[in-house]
């Protein structure tokens, strides 16, 4: 379940968004609402939401300032901007920080839901990619370890010119690194 924070200086908008959308059906947990940019910033640092739905103009920090600050900390956090301002400069600045969802007020419930679904889909793809990369790294390490063990075992099977002391030291180090894999 992804976590969502709603930030808007208008109480009616915060409450409407929180109550009219069936967040549970979207597998989203609304972790809080913030009445200004500073409160939103502090809540983000405390609650680590995956998605922040924010107004563009708020007291304390604007939505753009909030996005900029959070971008420095967590580039994976996703933002949906709700704005009453149809100004290209706002959207352009937001896009520089990875924001892909800029909704004009008044927007419909369905527009918010569509943005949430897109973000969720992108999130699932990113997580799948991270898991594949982690699995790849693990398999690569297992492969190299197995290759090294096989090379060493082949060398030992051919016989060596090691003294008994050197052989004991070698086997001690071998077991330390590879266990009893012989």
Where are these regions (language model features)?
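Extreme N-terminal starter segment of soluble prokaryotic enzymes
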Residues: 1-4
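Two-component/phosphorelay signaling modules centered on CheY-like receiver
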Residues: 11-32
């Amino acid at each position: 379940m992804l976590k969502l924070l709603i930030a808007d200086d208008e109480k009616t908008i915060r409450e409407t968004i929180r109550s009219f959308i069936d967040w549970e059906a979207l597998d989203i947990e609304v972790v809080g609402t913030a009445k200004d940019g500073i409160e939103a910033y502090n809540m983000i640092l405390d609650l680590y939401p995956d998605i922040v739905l924010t107004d563009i103009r708020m007291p304390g920090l604007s939505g753009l300032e909030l996005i900029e600050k959070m971008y420095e900390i967590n580039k994976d956090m996703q933002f949906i901007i709700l704005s009453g301002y149809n100004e290209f400069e706002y959207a352009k600045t937001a896009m520089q920080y990875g924001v892909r969802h800029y909704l004009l007020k008044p927007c419909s419930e369905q527009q918010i839901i569509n943005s949430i679904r897109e973000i969720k889909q992108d999130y699932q793809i990113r997580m799948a990619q991270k898991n594949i990369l982690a699995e790849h790294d693990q398999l690569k390490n297992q492969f190299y370890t197995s290759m090294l063990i096989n090379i060493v075992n082949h060398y030992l099977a051919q016989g060596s010119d090691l003294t008994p002391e050197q052989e004991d030291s070698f086997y001690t180090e071998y077991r330390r690194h590879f266990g009893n894999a012989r």
